């Protein structure tokens, strides 16, 4: 694959000049009252601009992350996207990182077609968002909920166990099973 930007370009013929959602499978976000994508769509419907889901990192999340540089707005939970940089480890503590959740407007396609591939030959969505933000409003939206990076083996296992425990039809039986195992 030639990067996330290339994957999004492959979907262009299906979009029909409408805003669309991008959900990356390695980020799972649990929020009991309002799913992450619903939070982003609500903000898109309110402001009518590209939305980038983000969350503040803590010390446990030490893998390389795309850290957002943004400017606060008068809108609660919404900031104006400026830039993104890759940060590793504790340098990322307390900073806002991109999640794998986006609501994009169709003008991203023209920008993606012009983005120069990086040193690995990948077309990066982050690069396209920087260009888009220089032309029009692009917002970051703080997503509420518990995030699991299921590309990380331990987070994958935690998500599996916690989701099973939350399910009404499995929770009690699964809890008993875990007690037997431990």
Regions found by a protein language model. Give the residues of each.
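Generic low-polarity alpha-helical segments
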Residues: 11, 68-70, 84-87
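Domain-scale signature associated with acetyltransferase and cell-envelope carbohydrate enzymes
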Residues: 180-182
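Cationic, amphipathic, low-complexity alpha-helical segments enriched
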Residues: 62-67, 71-78
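Conserved beta-loop-beta/alpha segment of the NTase-like Rossmann-fold superfamily
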Residues: 1-65, 104-106, 113
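Catalytic-core segments of class I nucleotidyltransferases/pyrophosphorylases
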Residues: 21, 34, 41-45, 74-148, ...
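ATP/pyrophosphate-binding catalytic subdomain of soluble kinases
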Residues: 54-57, 69-70, 81-82
């Amino acid at each position: 694959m030639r990067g996330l930007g290339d994957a999004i370009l492959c979907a262009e013929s299906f979009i029909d000049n409408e805003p669309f959602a991008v959900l990356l499978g390695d980020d799972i976000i649990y929020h009991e009252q309002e799913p992450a994508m619903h939070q982003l769509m609500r903000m898109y419907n309110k402001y009518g601009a590209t939305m980038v889901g983000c969350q503040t990192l803590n010390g446990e999340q030490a893998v390389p992350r795309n850290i957002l540089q943004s400017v606060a707005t008068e809108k609660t939970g919404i900031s104006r996207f400026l830039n993104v940089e890759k940060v590793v480890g504790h340098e990322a503590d307390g900073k806002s990182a991109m999640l794998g959740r986006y609501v994009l407007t169709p003008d991203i396609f023209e920008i993606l077609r012009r983005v120069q591939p990086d040193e690995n030959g990948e077309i990066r969505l982050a690069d396209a968002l920087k260009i888009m933000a220089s032309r029009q409003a692009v917002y970051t939206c703080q997503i509420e909920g518990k995030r699991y990076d299921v590309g990380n083996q331990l987070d994958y296992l935690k998500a599996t166990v916690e989701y099973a425990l939350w399910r009404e039809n499995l929770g009690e039986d699964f809890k008993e099973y875990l007690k037997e195992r431990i």
